[in-house]
Curated annotation (Swiss-Prot):
The gene is thyA. It comes from the Bacteria. Pfam families: Thymidylat_synt (PF00303). Pathway: Pyrimidine metabolism; dTTP biosynthesis. GO terms for cellular component: cytosol. (6R)-5,10-methylene-5,6,7,8-tetrahydrofolate binds at residues 169, 263. Belongs to the thymidylate synthase family. Bacterial-type ThyA subfamily. NCBIfam families: PRK01827.1-3, PRK01827.1-5, thym_sym. Homodimer. DUMP binds at residues 21, 126-127, 166-169, 177, 207-209. It comes from Bradyrhizobium sp. (strain ORS 278). This is Thymidylate synthase. Keywords: Cytoplasm, Methyltransferase, Nucleotide biosynthesis, Transferase. Its EC number is 2.1.1.45.
Length: 264
């Protein structure tokens, strides 16, 4: 995962000091890209431990089209608690836009179903896109989408995915996002009968919060270990049929967790 360490080092050396919505302050760079060959191992950061359960359940929650944290709580995941209202609702965030994008005539668009179907029918299409950034709904969301648009690409029987992330918390969020979208790409590849290509992660404002600087330096002092492997249950052929038990991570031997406070 040298790509991630290179990004941390770039921000520490070249980042501009900026104010931000949370009042914490950041070091920030604008425009960066990382590439991961998904056939070479599952891109899960090894220089600190990541919570696989939270990564998988959040992705399954998105794919359900859910926007209430009850499902997450039922599975012991609390990563969205700071933004939910008293009823556990978050407004029309990721899952709603992915599965139920509202149309002007009162209908809804299931972008996930559409993109999977299009990959099967027309893999050379340049319209294999899902977006969570809906300007009409942004003000209704507890937190506007940070990872806001992704595009699939098929070549030589391999599926790749590129994510555009407008805003990225490099210490807490980015390792999580890498693993989540790598996993989504694996799932889509399986249900469309394709091999694995690349996950390409493109950023707008990628930043290190001022209260994460020492943690980032600690992480950079650690030597990355071999990437783990992720195996999916080969019997699952429907993107919406995956369950937590269908994912098996092997060979994950990370350095210890590094505690850091989330900026709300």
């Amino acid at each position: 995962m040298h790509q991630y360490h290179d990004l941390l080092e770039r921000i520490l050396s070249d980042g501009a000091q900026k104010h931000d919505r949370t009042g914490t302050g950041t070091l920030s760079v604008f425009g960066h890209q990382m590439r991961f060959n998904l056939a070479a191992g599952f891109p899960m950061v090894t220089t600190k431990r990541l919570p696989l359960k939270a990564i998988v359940h959040e992705l399954l929650w998105f794919l359900k089209g859910d926007t209430n944290i009850k499902y997450l709580h039922d599975h012991g995941v609390t990563i969205w608690d700071e933004w939910a209202d008293a009823n556990g609702d978050l407004g029309p965030v990721y899952g709603y836009q992915w599965r139920s994008w509202p149309t002007s005539d009162g209908g809804q668009i299931d972008q996930i179903s559409n993109v999977v179907d299009m990959i099967r029918r027309n893999p050379d299409s340049r319209r294999l896109i899902v977006t969570a950034w809906n300007p009409a709904d942004v003000e209704k969301m507890a937190l506007p989408p940070c990872h806001c648009l992704f595009q699939f690409y098929v070549a030589n029987g391999k599926l790749s995915c590129q994510l555009y992330q407008r805003s990225a918390d490099v210490f807490l969020g980015v390792p999580f996002n890498i693993a989540s979208y790598a996993l989504l790409t694996m799932m889509v590849a399986q249900v469309t009968g394709l091999k694995l290509g690349e996950f390409v992660h493109s950023f707008g404002d990628v930043h290190l919060y001022s209260n994460h600087i020492e943690q980032a330096r600690l992480q950079l002092s650690r030597t990355p270990r071999p990437l783990p492997t992720m195996t999916l249950n080969p019997d699952v052929k429907d993107i919406f049929a995956f369950r937590y038990e269908d994912f098996a991570l092997a060979g994950y031997d990370p350095h210890p967790h590094i505690k850091a406070e989330v900026a709300v």
